[in-house]
Each structure stands twice: as structure tokens, then as C-alpha cells.
Amino acid sequence: AGTDQEHPRMIVYSHTVTPDRTTFLLGKGPDPTEYIKDGLNTLIGWGADMLCVTCNTAHHFIDGFRDEISKPIVHIIDETILKSSQVCPQGAWLTATLGTMRTGLYQRHAKDSG
């Protein structure tokens, strides 16, 4: 976009009481699934017609209920793998949280995409 007016309209929702995703995945905290799902449905209620979650680890939970959400979700893992394969077909490095690494999100989605 060349100007502010050319950017898409966005709603940002930061629900700061959502339990830490990595802490849960390491067995040390509460499950954040319902908070994440509630946040997505809140955005839909506010008029969002497409959703994007910028937390890699959150997609571990989103994968479990993605079909329950009535609007499309831009999946950060799938989009990263797609772009990485176009830019660097021989492979790419990943820097991520321990939670993202332990879930095997990128490995699983990369395998599924071929």
C-alpha cells in the first residue's frame, strides 16, 4: 500500500488474560483453547470477515477447532510454509518458541503440504 487509506480495514483484539500457550503445552498451566476460540468469535461478532492470528503456537489449538469458526482463518503456519517453499525450495530455518517446536506444527504442516 502506498498510503494509509490503501491498507485493509483491521480490528485488533488482544485478550491479555489468555493463558500462555507454551506454558500449557509444557504441562505447567491452564488450557488457552476456549480463550482463543472466544477471541476469534468476538472478532466475528465485531464484523471481521477474515481472521489472522499472529501467534504461531496458537495455531496448535486453532487446528483443533478450525472447522467450528464461521469465517476463514489465514493460517500463519501454512502461509509461511507456502512462501518459504517459493523463496527457498531447498529448505529454510525456523526460529520459534519451545511450544511451537514441541508441537511439531511446522513439521506436520510441511509434511501435509508435500
Regions found by a protein language model. Name each.
Residues 1-114:
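Non-catalytic structural scaffold of enzyme domains
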